[in-house]
Regions:
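Residues at alpha-helix boundaries and short interhelical turns
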Residues: 23, 69-73, 135
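Short N-terminal or domain-adjacent regulatory/targeting segments
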Residues: 42-53, 214-234
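Walker A (P-loop) phosphate-binding motif
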Residues: 45-113
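Phosphate/Mg2+-binding loops and adjacent switch elements
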Residues: 99-219, 226-231
């Protein structure tokens, strides 16, 4: 049964990729749902910006790293790099993240390199293991920032994957884009891969491209720190 489930997920993933990143007529059938989704996203954003919904503002600057599309674009590696560079320049950064796939009974959670990934999720542990700064995980970014500032001496907060979390005020926004897939077919979910419209990118302070950048974007490249033996080879 587990094998059947694996192949089903693989087939579903391929189907979604064809719709989002290729030319597939199914994307047009999903456009009405994308319009509804876009209206909800816009209304939610306006509710925070107009003060209808409360926004938490930290006493220190908040730098958000995020994107407008679903999937991995390099947000976490960039957050790790920023934490390292800020530390080198004498700042005392702290990181908050969503705790994606974590199953903690209560949030937010203080994260260490040896924390249980079942509780806080893999990404939170990756952040803690690859930086020397405090990390707090939780789906409510505002509460996570509060917990971070209450327990740690931090003078700047890095928020990993936080662009759509408008309940948290931010001072700087960095959007990360996959240099190969870019924005796919340019449509909103579920017709395309976008969480927000491409126009949202005009509001950010910087666009970082994980790959070959377009005009006005900054390039990002992965660089290996070390080689590790992962198998028993003679």
């Amino acid at each position: 049964m587990s094998g059947d489930r694996f192949y089903f997920k693989l087939a579903l993933h391929r189907c979604i990729n064809e719709i989002w990143y290729g030319r597939n007529f199914w994307q047009y059938l999903l456009v009405p749902f994308a319009c509804f989704y876009g209206a909800v996203v816009w209304a939610r954003k306006m509710a925070y910006e107009s003060g209808v919904l409360n926004v938490f503002r930290a006493r220190v600057p908040v730098l958000v790293v995020g994107n407008v599309s679903v999937g991995g674009t390099g947000k976490t590696p960039l957050t790790i790099w920023l934490a390292s560079r800020l530390t080198d320049f004498g700042f005392k950064p702290g990181i908050v993240c969503g705790g994606y796939r974590g199953r903690a009974k209560s949030w937010p959670q203080q994260v260490r390199a040896d924390s249980d990934n079942y509780v806080v999720g893999d990404e939170a542990i990756i952040l803690a293991a690859n930086t020397s700064v405090p990390v707090v995980a939780g789906p409510d970014r505002g509460q996570s920032v509060k917990a971070l500032l209450e327990k740690h001496d931090v003078d700047i907060v890095l928020c990993d994957d936080g662009m759509q979390h408008y309940a948290l005020a931010r001072d700087i926004e960095i959007a990360v884009i996959n240099g190969v897939q870019r924005l796919g077919n340019g449509k909103l979910l579920p017709a395309g891969p976008l969480r927000e419209s491409r126009e949202r990118l005009a509001e950010v302070d910087m666009i970082v491209c994980n790959g070959i950048p377009a005009r006005g974007e900054f390039a990002m490249k992965y660089k290996a720190d070390e080689l590790r033996k992962v198998g028993n080879t003679e």
